[in-house]
Amino acid sequence: MEEKVESTTTPDGPCVVSVQETEKWMEEAMRMAKEALENIEVPVGCLMVYNNEVVGKGRNEVNQTKNATRHAEMVAIDQVLDWCHQHGQSPSTVFEHTVLYVTVEPCIMCAAALRLMKIPLVVYGCQNERFGGCGSVLNIASADLPNTGRPFQCIPGYRAEEAVELLKTFYKQENPNAPKSKVRKKDCQKS
């Protein structure tokens, strides 16, 4: 018997995920995060799963594209929209039945986008203490925000330690896109 992790209500009934599904999809999200790290990106990876099928996936592409909005979730949202177009599906119907699996708590921008898309459930790894939009900084996920889509359920903490270790590895590196320092060093002469 499959152990159920969580459920939330969608327009057509409950959205339920099992421990086995969560492990399977979070493994793939971690793979995406590692791919981001290999490409000198903040290591965040995600999958959007509709009817047990990955319809969108993403990893951060901010440094690669020089576009600050290309977070993993935004890349995945674009892929879901493309999938809907290719399969003749209504994006609103698909998003209302899609679960997001992501290695790090979505930032405020991404949480707002997920809410507007009416994603019912987000499963994430570690908290985002600086920019988290699911409770760490702001709670976009469940706040009473008129005309901003539908609140969504969050399940935090899946493989959080692994996600934190990936982030630590990234932040130990030098950022090749950081601007050159404009501080001039004085010449020191011995007297």
Curated annotation (Swiss-Prot):
InterPro entries: APOBEC/CMP_deaminase_Zn-bd, CMP_dCMP_dom, Cytidine_deaminase-like, tRNA_aden_deaminase. Its cofactor is Zn(2+). One of its GO terms (biological process) is tRNA wobble adenosine to inosine editing. Disulfide bonds: none annotated. GO terms for molecular function: tRNA-specific adenosine-34 deaminase activity; zinc ion binding. It is an enzyme of class 3 (hydrolase). The keyword Kinase does not apply. Residues 20-145 form the CMP/dCMP-type deaminase domain. Belongs to the cytidine and deoxycytidylate deaminase family. ADAT2 subfamily. HAMAP family: tRNA_aden_deaminase (MF_00972). Probably participates in deamination of adenosine-34 to inosine in many tRNAs. This is tRNA-specific adenosine deaminase 2.
